[in-house]
Amino acid sequence: FVFIPNVQPMSALLFLVAFSYRLSDALMIALLSLLGTNIYLGMGPWTISQLAALTITIILFHQFGKIPIIKKNRFLQAFFAFLCGLLYGLIISLMEVWLYQFPSFLAYYLQGLLFDFFHASGNFVFYLLLWPVFERITPTSYKLAKKNE
C-alpha cells in the first residue's frame, strides 16, 4: 500500500486487538509494533508523538468497544476506527507543532488533513477486511468474549 500515503493495516490491526483483548495486551503490542517499525524505518522525535497518539486512540477504542451497540456492530467499530485515525492525526499535529515550534497550528494541520483522511479511510477499510481473518486466527478470544456478553 506504499502507493497510497498513510494507508497501512497496522492501526486497524491494533484496534482489532484493543477490541478483542485486554487493554494492557493491546498497548504492549502497539508499543512493540511501533518501536519495531521505527527501528526498521527510522526513529526520530516523531516516535514520541506516534506513541502518545497511538496510546490515546487505543485506549479510546478499547473503552468505546465496551458500549453494547458498538460491541455488536462491526460497521460502527470500523467507523470509530475511522474517527480514531482522524484523532491520531490531530494529536500528532498538536505535538509536532509544539515540538518544532511551528508558528501556526492551523496551517500545519490543514496541510496534513488529506493524509489524515487517507489514514482514517484505511483504518475503516482494513478493519472491515481484517475482521474475519482476525476472528479465524484468534477464535479463543472471541469465544470468551461471546461468553462474557
Region spans (language model):
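Generic transmembrane alpha-helix motif of multi-pass integral membrane proteins
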Residues: P9-A26, L60-F64
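Transmembrane helix irregularities
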Residues: S20-Y21, I39, S121
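Interfacial aromatic-anchored transmembrane helix boundaries in multi-pass membrane proteins
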Residues: F1-P9, L31-G65
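A generic alpha-helix surface/boundary motif
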Residues: M10-A12, A30, G89-L90
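Membrane-interface helix caps of multi-pass small-molecule transporters
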Residues: F3, L16, I59, Q63, ...
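Central hydrophobic cores of alpha-helical transmembrane segments
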Residues: A26-N38, L76-G85
